[in-house]
């Protein structure tokens, strides 16, 4: 097999992971499983993130502290493990609040006005 693509969903409406920590552990497990199924293949995580505002869904709680911790933990793990990651999203997307529930608009590292959320 010269190339392959795998798709696994981490936390749309927090449907798989009950917590921020669980989302990262799930992603790490999926990378291990993908490596086992396709040894030597380049792995790119094309979208991951954690919202900083909105309603909790079971044990998944959006918060500024949680979003920052998820970002830092993801980047540190990805660098240590040689994984390429596209973090979602650069900016909050205010228009998504209806279609994606009240968390949909709050996945950015910067707010909708371009101000950084984390210092």
Residue ranges and their predicted role:
Residues 56-66, 77-119:
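Aromatic-rich peripheral "rim/lid" segments of glycoside hydrolase catalytic domains that contact
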